[in-house]
Structure formats: C-alpha cells, structure tokens
From Swiss-Prot:
Gene: PRKCH
A Pfam cross-reference name: PRKCH_uORF2
Protein name, per record: PRKCH upstream open reading frame 2
Claim: DNA repair is one of the keywords in the record: no
Listed GO MF terms: protein serine/threonine kinase binding; protein serine/threonine kinase inhibitor activity; translation regulator activity
Length: 26
C-alpha cells in the first residue's frame, strides 16, 4: 500500500487548504 502513503503525503499539506475552502463555501 505504498500508493496509499504517497497519497496521504500529498494530501497532508492539501487537507488544511481543503478545510479552509469548505469552511468558506459552507
């Protein structure tokens, strides 16, 4: 499941951004 770790690593920095976007949209 190396791809899973890579995805998590790529999403890690993007998660906060997504949260901010969702908060602004909500």
């Amino acid at each position: 499941m190396a791809s899973r770790g890579a995805l998590r690593r790529c999403l890690s920095p993007g998660l906060p951004r997504l949260l901010h976007l969702s908060r602004g949209l909500a």
